[in-house]
From Swiss-Prot:
<dbReference type="InterPro" id="IPR013118">
    <property type="entry name" value="Mannitol_DH_C"/>
</dbReference>
<dbReference type="InterPro" id="IPR013328">
    <property type="entry name" value="6PGD_dom2"/>
</dbReference>
<dbReference type="Pfam" id="PF01232">
    <property type="entry name" value="Mannitol_dh"/>
</dbReference>
<dbReference type="Pfam" id="PF08125">
    <property type="entry name" value="Mannitol_dh_C"/>
</dbReference>
<protein>
    <recommendedName>
        <fullName>Mannitol-1-phosphate 5-dehydrogenase</fullName>
        <ecNumber>1.1.1.17</ecNumber>
    </recommendedName>
</protein>
<dbReference type="InterPro" id="IPR013131">
    <property type="entry name" value="Mannitol_DH_N"/>
</dbReference>
<keyword id="KW-0520">NAD</keyword>
<comment type="similarity">
    <text>Belongs to the mannitol dehydrogenase family.</text>
</comment>
<dbReference type="GO" id="GO:0008926">
    <property type="term" value="F:mannitol-1-phosphate 5-dehydrogenase activity"/>
</dbReference>
<feature type="modified residue" description="N6-acetyllysine">
    <location>
        <position position="269"/>
    </location>
</feature>
<keyword id="KW-0560">Oxidoreductase</keyword>
<dbReference type="InterPro" id="IPR023027">
    <property type="entry name" value="Mannitol_DH_CS"/>
</dbReference>
<dbReference type="InterPro" id="IPR008927">
    <property type="entry name" value="6-PGluconate_DH-like_C_sf"/>
</dbReference>
<dbReference type="InterPro" id="IPR000669">
    <property type="entry name" value="Mannitol_DH"/>
</dbReference>
<dbReference type="InterPro" id="IPR036291">
    <property type="entry name" value="NAD(P)-bd_dom_sf"/>
</dbReference>
<dbReference type="GO" id="GO:0019592">
    <property type="term" value="P:mannitol catabolic process"/>
</dbReference>
<dbReference type="InterPro" id="IPR023028">
    <property type="entry name" value="Mannitol_1_phos_5_DH"/>
</dbReference>
Length: 382
């Protein structure tokens, strides 16, 4: 089996690429970073530090790399069995034209073996969004063929991969946590379902997408925002602060109550899942910076994302949400010189005031009780 993976960054190498290579799949990375491409093609291997209770070093071998903006990537799409991505939500649109060209070439070459494309991004139904971009880039006469022969498979991914603080200056070395979860929608595949250790197949993807979004992502973001306000540097430092931990755990329990109501998750198992996530935030090997985790607050405060979506669920089912409100207020305080969204957020609040700004970003009614609660909490943090 041959696979092409877009994105040779830390998540690409440390998570999805590693799982594919470990499964014996012939893997080629596509990226724009020439230093990483050259290193991969010189060595065809790299090291992954897997850290949890203990630390182990795994070697991923037999990999190649191509530029994601050249002809090579188009040729590969015409040949491979699987295309995966870990490029970040905003980059999906940029890689779509190359994928479209590759699919046209595949059609022209008469390659009708099934191809499945899986976007492994921190977003809800990312592959469906990628499909929209690809379809827009396709000529009309190729669209029906692509619908017939190409599966666009949505997935939920979960593994903390902090930026590498490698002492060796090795551009390929990466550190990841022991925990990993890659859940894919088995109803969307073309052809036989793949058997890849570490890839979990489900016919109820949205339950797992929301479980991860409402727990890991919600908890991670709130830890970062409250941690930064309290002057902590890392996620571990922040979650070991008892005041912050209580709010984060409370927020995950509030969002969890929505999941239990909506999808019928077992309450005891979900409580154990929350505990596992708190343990992951405490991992001493992961030097995860609160500023990195908190960045892009406008996206994280949008209606379909990790703070507002669970809040809307609590309103739908008339459930408590005081800790989620604290997290939203913390996000409104997020400031970073390196993050354009943080600067835009600050400007919006300065211009319109917190009430109108939050309503505009989140889609919540400016005159609603929850916006009033969030503004009160926001002002109390000043």
């Amino acid at each position: 089996m041959k696979a092409l993976h877009f994105g040779a960054g830390n998540i690409g190498r440390g998570f999805i690429g590693k799982l594919l290579a470990d499964a014996g799949i012939q893997l080629t990375f596509a990226d724009v970073n020439q230093v990483v491409l050259d290193a991969l093609n010189a060595r065809h291997s790299y090291q992954v530090h897997v850290v949890g209770e203990t630390e182990q070093v795994d070697t991923v071998s037999g990999v190649n790399a191509v530029s994601s903006i050249g002809d090579d990537v188009v040729d590969l799409i015409a040949q491979v069995d699987l295309v995966t991505t870990a490029v970040g939500p905003v980059v999906l649109e940029r890689i779509a034209p190359a994928i479209a060209k590759g699919l046209v070439k595949r059609k022209e070459q008469g390659n009708e073996s099934p191809l499945n494309i899986i976007a492994c991004e921190n977003m809800v139904r990312g592959t469906t969004q990628l499909k929209g971009h690809v379809m827009n880039a396709l000529p009309e006469d190729a669209k029906a063929w692509v619908e017939e022969h190409v599966g666009f498979v949505d997935s939920a991914v979960d593994r903390i991969v902090p930026p590498s603080a490698s002492a060796t200056n090795d551009p390929l070395e990466v550190t990841v946590e022991t925990f990993s979860e890659w859940i894919v929608d088995k109803t969307q595949f073309k052809g036989a379902l793949p058997n890849i250790p570490g890839m979990e197949l489900t016919d109820n993807l949205m339950a797992f997408v929301e479980r991860k979004l409402f727990t890991l992502n919600t908890g991670h973001a709130i830890t970062a925002y409250l941690g930064k306000l309290a002057g902590h540097q890392t996620i571990r430092d922040a979650i070991l602060d008892e005041k912050i931990r209580a709010v984060v755990k409370g927020a995950m329990e509030e969002s969890g109550a929505v999941l239990i109501k909506r999808y019928g998750f077992d309450a005891d198992k979900h409580a154990a899942y929350i505990q596992k996530i708190l343990g992951r935030f405490e991992n001493p090997y992961l030097k995860d910076d609160v500023e990195r985790v908190g960045r892009q607050p406008l996206r994280k405060l949008s209606a379909g994302d990790r703070l507002i979506k669970p809040l809307l669920g609590t309103l739908e089912y008339s459930l408590p949400h005081k800790n989620l409100i604290q997290g939203i207020a913390g996000a409104m305080h997020f400031r970073s010189e390196d993050d354009p969204q943080a600067q835009e957020l600050a400007a919006l609040i300065a211009d319109k005031g917190p009430q109108a700004a939050l309503a505009q970003i989140s889609g919540l009614d400016a005159n609603s009780e929850v916006v009033s609660e969030a503004v009160t909490a926001y002002k109390a943090m000043q």
